[in-house]
């Protein structure tokens, strides 16, 4: 087990960076003339549109870039969630030294362990309730705001029940069921918690690597057939589409720089960041490369974490990102509320005024909701 690769403050700073990308993306991609992303499916015309915008930049270039790339905050969250699971549940010293060596040495063999089915169910129940506690406050507030503002959603019983039960991702046409859209993440996380506990928890590294390769392979097959298909859409709405960054988080927590290398030199890390950003941009322009972008997103976030901690003049940015990371859960569940209110300003022509009001209101409300969520008792493990 690799110890203290990412500190708690570094994880919070990366959560802050990730949620900034997510909540700005979820505003910008709603604007008609702005480049659209390839999040669940790969549309070549979206990649070509980005190239056209980069060749002829205008005042809206930052909006285009946030719309196209901002959703990659989700893989960062998956990476950090997996990292946190391993550090919480696998770093505890309840195995002998020999057992630890066999379990975590990359070349070692896994021992077989007999466990009661009750413990995995308790684990899944605990994490479902944690997600529910986070989601329900924002969902209640959003549905009320949605009802009293123009363009209210017509909810159906199945949509509501599946949202609260977090199984909406597996239903047909998830785009038409999940509302607000960002809440698809809760169903995804619940699936990954189940996969982790039943298949990957304290298992040989080959289980994680094998599942990653299997999910990537199936996605490539779907992409070669039709990357714009509904089959690809449904596939990436579920745990298979997030297995690459989630698996990397597990392996990085266990083996550290054997998986994702940092250089412990600010100058070298800066070059590493530039290299990753260049690769992310170029790989995003074709279907095969797009499949592997989350790997370089995870590598970039590790390099950024190392850089922020190494360079003293970045300490102010580091502290701001760390604070945003602390309120990231509340910001995630509440930003659809402020988006619904302020998006008309940007749609009617004043893009940056609407965006600025949205940012200010979202962060303020997220801080308030963070205080509110502290009042809700945590589930018992």
Language-model segments: residues:
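Membrane-cytosol interface segments of multi-pass membrane proteins
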Residues: 1-216, 347-381
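Histidine-centered divalent metal-coordination motifs
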Residues: 25-26, 332-335
């Amino acid at each position: 087990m690799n110890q203290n690769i990412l500190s708690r403050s570094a994880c919070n700073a990366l959560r802050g960076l990730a949620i900034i990308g997510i909540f700005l993306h979820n505003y910008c991609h709603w604007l008609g003339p702005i480049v659209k992303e390839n999040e669940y499916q790969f549309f070549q015309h979206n990649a070509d549109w980005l190239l056209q915008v980069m060749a002829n930049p205008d005042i809206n270039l930052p909006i285009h870039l946030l719309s196209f790339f901002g959703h990659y905050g989700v893989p960062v969250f998956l990476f950090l969630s997996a990292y946190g699971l391993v550090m919480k549940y696998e770093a505890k010293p309840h195995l002998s030294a020999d057992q630890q060596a066999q379990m975590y040495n990359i070349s070692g063999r896994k021992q077989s362990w007999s466990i009661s089915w009750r413990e995995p169910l308790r684990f899944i129940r605990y994490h479902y309730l944690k997600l529910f506690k986070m989601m329900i406050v924002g969902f209640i507030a959003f549905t009320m705001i949605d009802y009293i503002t123009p363009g209210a959603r017509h909810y159906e019983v199945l949509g509501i029940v599946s949202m609260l039960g977090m199984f909406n991702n597996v239903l047909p046409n998830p785009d038409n069921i999940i509302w607000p859209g960002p809440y698809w993440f809760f169903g995804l996380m619940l699936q990954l918690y189940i996969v982790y506990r039943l298949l990957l928890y304290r298992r040989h590294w080959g289980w994680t690597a094998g599942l990653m390769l299997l999910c990537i392979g199936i996605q490539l097959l779907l992409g070669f057939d039709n990357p714009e298909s509904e089959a690809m859409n449904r596939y990436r709405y579920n745990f298979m589409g997030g297995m690459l960054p989630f698996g990397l988080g597990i392996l990085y927590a266990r083996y550290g720089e054997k998986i994702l290398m940092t250089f412990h030199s600010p100058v070298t890390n800066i070059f590493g960041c530039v290299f990753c950003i260049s690769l992310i941009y170029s790989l995003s322009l074709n279907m095969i490369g797009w499949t592997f972008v989350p790997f370089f997103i995870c590598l970039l976030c590790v390099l950024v974490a190392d850089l922020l901690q190494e360079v003293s003049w970045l300490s102010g940015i580091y502290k701001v990102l760390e604070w945003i990371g602390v309120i990231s859960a509340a910001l995630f569940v509440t930003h659809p509320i402020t988006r619904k209110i302020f998006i008309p300003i940007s749609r009617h022509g004043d893009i940056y005024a609407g965006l600025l009001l949205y940012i200010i209101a979202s962060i303020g409300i997220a801080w308030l909701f963070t205080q509110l969520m502290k009042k809700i008792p945590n589930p018992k493990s």
